[in-house]
């Protein structure tokens, strides 16, 4: 068994090595990659493998159905910024290293998008019906998918103290920078 980034076990590829091309799966992968919002999504498409577990396949299909329906019914789904910041995160693990400004800005926007998307999905099933009661869960699979996702709002707040909404370093990012910029004015 092979494990993807989503930590779900999937079977190894079917022999022969060109099986996907022979049955047209490679063209489906290309179509999926065209719709990905980030390079990380494209990587996940590359990692997809055949699955023969009916329950898992049905779960994935329900997630897709719900998300397609959600995109058709709601124009306000927060899907604005998804950046693959893994290289920067790997680099800053070393002591005395830090994000470059652009990396921090991408990291902040990605975290914010994830935070808003998870809150949006969680809020879907808390909406009230016409009688003022909590509406029936119409997006159960998406709700389950979002359940337990950590969104790190404190990191978003800390990044906001350093960069503004345009990705520029704030004068108040540090006392030293604030002093230098005041002296330059």
What do the PLM-derived regions correspond to, one by one?
Residues 2-169, 173:
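Conserved amphipathic alpha-helical "coupling/scaffold" segments
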């Amino acid at each position: 068994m092979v494990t993807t980034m989503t930590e779900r076990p999937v079977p190894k590829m079917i022999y022969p090595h060109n099986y996907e091309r022979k049955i047209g799966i490679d063209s489906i992968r290309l179509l999926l990659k065209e719709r990905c919002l980030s390079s990380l999504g494209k990587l996940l498409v590359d990692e997809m493998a055949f699955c023969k577990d009916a329950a898992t396949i049905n779960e994935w299909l329900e997630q897709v159905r719900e998300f397609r329906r959600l995109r058709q019914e709601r124009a306000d789904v927060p899907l604005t910024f998804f950046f693959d910041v893994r290289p920067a995160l790997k680099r800053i693990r070393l002591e005395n290293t830090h994000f470059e400004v652009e990396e921090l800005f991408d990291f902040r926007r990605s975290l914010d998008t994830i935070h808003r998307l998870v809150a949006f999905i969680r809020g879907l099933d808390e909406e009230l019906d016409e009688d003022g009661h909590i509406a029936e869960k119409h997006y159960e699979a998406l709700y389950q998918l979002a359940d337990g996702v950590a969104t790190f709002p404190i990191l978003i707040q800390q990044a906001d103290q350093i960069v503004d909404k345009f990705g520029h370093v704030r004068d108040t990012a540090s006392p030293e920078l604030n002093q230098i910029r005041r002296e330059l004015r």
